[in-house]
Regions:
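GNAT/GCN5-related N-acetyltransferase fold signature
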Residues: 84, 119-121
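OB-fold (S1/OB) nucleic-acid-binding surfaces
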Residues: 56, 66, 72-99
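OB/S1-fold single-stranded nucleic-acid-binding modules
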Residues: 1-55, 191-218
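Extended, charge-rich, solvent-exposed interface segments
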Residues: 100-101, 105-114, 120, 126-213, ...
Length: 218
C-alpha cells in the first residue's frame, strides 16, 4: 500500500506571528542537527530557521502592516521590494523570479495599503558584516481592519508567551538568544503589552459605540 501525501511529504512549519522590531533582529540562521540528516551526515535538506530574540525559532512568519513603499530594485529578473510598517517598526519583503504571483500582486498594489505577508525569513550579510533580515513572500494579501486587529492581538499574545518563557529560562532557544543578541527585552515587552492593550481598548470602545441606542429619525 502506498503512503499518503501526508506521510511522504514533509509538513510545512507553522508560520510564527512576529512584530517587525523582533524580526529585524533575528539575524542568526540555523538548522537542527537531527532534522532530515543526509547520507553523508550533513542535514542539507533540513529546514532552516531564524533564531528569534525571544528564544523561539521561525521557519515561516506571518506578519502584517501598512505598505508604505514599493520599489523595483532589479530589471532582470524583475524584483520588487516593499516596505511594510507595523506598530513596532518597518520590515522589507522582496519578490522576484521565485515569487511571480507576488511580483504581479505588488505591481498592481498602490501604497498605502494594509497587507498580510506569509513567507520565509531571509538574511543577507554585507561585505562590512552587517546582516539584514527580510521576508521572502509566499503570499501577500490586502486585509481589513478586523483582520489586522485580530492578528495584532494574536501576535502580542504569542510574543508575550515567548518572552515569559525566556524570562523563566524555559524558552527552547533562550540560551542561544542571550548569547547572540544584544536586545532590550524590557522596552520590547513594555511596547508589546501596550500594543495589545490598545487593541483591546479600541475594540471595546467600538463595541460600546455600536451598542448605543440610535435616536429616532424625525
Amino acid at each position: 500500500m502506498s503512503q499518503s501525501n501526508s506521510q511522504s511529504q514533509p509538513q510545512r512549519n507553522e508560520a510564527v506571528r512576529v512584530f517587525a522590531s523582533e524580526f529585524n533582529e533575528a539575524s542568526i540562521e540555523f538548522q537542527e542537527q537531527n532534522d532530515i540528516d543526509g547520507e553523508d551526515g550533513e542535514n542539507s535538506r533540513a529546514p532552516k530557521y531564524h533564531l528569534l530574540p525571544s528564544g523561539g525559532r521561525a521557519n515561516r512568519v506571518l506578519m502584517m502592516g501598512t505598505v508604505t513603499e514599493i520599489e523595483q530594485v532589479s530589471d532582470s529578473p524583475v524584483t520588487l521590494r516593499a516596505k511594510i510598517v507595523d506598530q513596532t517598526g518597518g520590515f522589507f519583503t522582496y519578490a522576484g523570479k521565485y515569487n511571480p504571483d507576488e511580483v504581479s500582486y505588488l505591481q498592481n498594489l498602490e501604497a498605502p495599503e494594509h497587507v498580510m505577508v506569509v513567507g520565509k525569513p531571509n538574511s543577507y550579510t554585507t561585505d562590512d558584516g552587517d546582516t539584514y533580515v527580510s521576508v521572502e513572500p509566499e503570499n501577500i494579501t490586502v486585509v481589513e481592519k478586523e483582520t489586522r486587529d485580530r492578528w495584532t492581538a494574536e501576535a502580542a499574545v504569542q510574543t508575550l508567551d515567548r518572552l515569559d518563557a525566556f524570562h523563566e529560562d524555559d524558552a527552547p532557544y533562550g540560551d542561544e538568544a542571550s548569547q547572540y543578541y544584544d536586545f532590550d527585552y524590557e522596552d520590547f515587552q513594555a511596547d508589546i503589552e501596550e500594543i495589545g492593550a490598545e487593541v483591546v481598548d479600541e475594540n471595546a470602545n467600538e463595541t460600546d459605540a455600536a451598542a448605543q441606542p440610535q435616536a429616532p429619525s424625525a
